Amino acid sequence: MRRHAIILAAGKGTRMKSKKYKVLHEVAGKPMVEHVLESVKGSGVDQVVTIVGHGAESVKGHLGERSLYSFQEEQLGTAHAVQMAKSHLEDKEGTTIVVCGDTPLITKETLVTLIAHHEDANAQATVLSASIQQPYGYGRIVRNASGRLERIVEEKDATQAEKDINEISSGIFAFNNKTLFEKLTQVKNDNAQGEYYLPDVLSLILNDGGIVEVYRTNDVEEIMGVNDRVMLSQAEKAMQRRTNHYHMLNGVTIIDPDSTYIGPDVTIGSDTVIEPGVRINGRTEIGEDVVIGQYSEINNSTIENGACIQQSVVNDASVGANTKVGPFAQLRPGAQLGADVKVGNFVEIKKADLKDGAKVSHLSYIGDAVIGERTNIGCGTITVNYDGENKFKTIVGKDSFVGCNVNLVAPVTIGDDVLVAAGSTITDDVPNDSLAVARARQTTKEGYRK
């Protein structure tokens, strides 16, 4: 059976009080609507149509070709929004799910179960519901004496007795696609909001003797909609708990989950330890037996087995096995550290390749460079890579020793087994097995201060 999805993403989100389009506000480093799209695609649908309105181009820019789009010029209600997908879906057979773009916590597993329940019951429509303690603002599930769905009533149209019901509609539905578009043309806007409500389609189906099912989820967090910054914060916290819980169940030690933020696309190997205050985002891959020290930040990077990152920032970089970074080091984009490398305190590495066993232990800047195997870079060494217009490369061979407070003025190549004396400013290439000294000879005037 063919399956389709409609994501409702046309709302202005005035309560967010933001210039940014509502569904593009981020949860766990990713726009809300992107979380929804990934869950929808993961549920196995064949085609997705996203309904966009204000800020349409920005949504398209994020989702790209993963979705088709329909434009809703006026926001006249959820039924009106779904009807905008008519040109893409009206003649399709199969099941269509409707999901709100501001429900970033919905999972593909719940959508798969909703679709299966809907199709197994041979229903024309199925609503995803939940029972919550504070149902204010949600449509209520009104059941008849036999427990079947009678209707869904919106908050502003509900009687007091209906407002006391704590089973609510999530705003997520599964429909027989043909039935959906047939009934949408019959929906009226005679309600307190003057809008065309999608739940009215369910009433029309029931009035014709059709089958409408309710599938209740026990995970209330999944259906949480985000309408303001407070709810955005709640969604962020919920996603954080979910992600950390997943990693801990898969063998990762997280010392303080409440202060640890791990993005949804991060992978972490077993027996890795994450200390308090850590942030790991983007498409970061962390191996086994790694230690990420407190207050470190890692983005879009690869950390191999046995490495240790202490109170450092790592962006778009790679760290080899058993390598030690920090404390207070910064790996900028393009930093590539081999195995058993040491990058110590107050060292900055940018677009540089440090081969296995290389050491840069203190107070150095290494940029646009290659440092050979087992080479030691002394405290205060600087690669002078920029002339105000262009960047130039520094190459240091293997098994070399660069003393403290050395300037390597690029472009320059230092060979293998070279000793560069402390305090030197090196402007010329140095061949293998050499000593390079480039500093003024010391003059001492005895008795000068008497």
Curated annotation (Swiss-Prot):
Amino-acid positions noted as binding UDP-N-acetyl-alpha-D-glucosamine in the UniProt annotation, renumbered to this chain: 8-11, 22, 72, 77-78, 139, 154, 227, 332, 350, 365, 376
Substrates-to-products reaction catalysed: alpha-D-glucosamine 1-phosphate + acetyl-CoA = N-acetyl-alpha-D-glucosamine 1-phosphate + CoA + H(+); N-acetyl-alpha-D-glucosamine 1-phosphate + UTP + H(+) = UDP-N-acetyl-alpha-D-glucosamine + diphosphate
Disulfide feature: none
CDD domains per UniProt: GT2_GlmU_N_bac (cd02540), LbH_GlmU_C (cd03353)
Keywords: Acyltransferase, Cell shape, Cell wall biogenesis/degradation, Cytoplasm, Magnesium, Metal-binding, Multifunctional enzyme, Nucleotidyltransferase, Peptidoglycan synthesis, Repeat, Transferase
Active site: H362 (proton acceptor)
Cellular component GO terms held in the UniProt record: cytoplasm; membrane
Positions with a binding annotation for Mg(2+): D102, N227
Residue ranges, annotated region (Linker): 230-250
Residues annotated to bind acetyl-CoA: N385, Y386, A422, R439
Compartment list: Cytoplasm
GO annotation, biological process: cell morphogenesis; cell wall organization; lipid A biosynthetic process; peptidoglycan biosynthetic process; regulation of cell shape; UDP-N-acetylglucosamine biosynthetic process
Keyword Zinc on entry: no
Region called N-acetyltransferase, residue ranges: 251-450
Region of interest called Pyrophosphorylase, as start-end residue ranges on this chain: 1-229
Cofactor remark from the record: Binds 1 Mg(2+) ion per subunit.
Top EC group: transferase
GO molecular function: glucosamine-1-phosphate N-acetyltransferase activity; magnesium ion binding; UDP-N-acetylglucosamine diphosphorylase activity
Cofactor(s) needed by this chain: Mg(2+)
Entry superkingdom: Bacteria
Pathway this chain belongs to: Nucleotide-sugar biosynthesis; UDP-N-acetyl-alpha-D-glucosamine biosynthesis; N-acetyl-alpha-D-glucosamine 1-phosphate from alpha-D-glucosamine 6-phosphate (route II): step 2/2; Nucleotide-sugar biosynthesis; UDP-N-acetyl-alpha-D-glucosamine biosynthesis; UDP-N-acetyl-alpha-D-glucosamine from N-acetyl-alpha-D-glucosamine 1-phosphate: step 1/1; Bacterial outer membrane biogenesis; LPS lipid A biosynthesis
Oligomer and partners: Homotrimer.
UniProt xrefs under PANTHER family: BIFUNCTIONAL PROTEIN GLMU, NUCLEOTIDYL TRANSFERASE
Protein name: Bifunctional protein GlmU
Species the sequence originates in: Staphylococcus aureus (strain NCTC 8325 / PS 47)
Gene: glmU
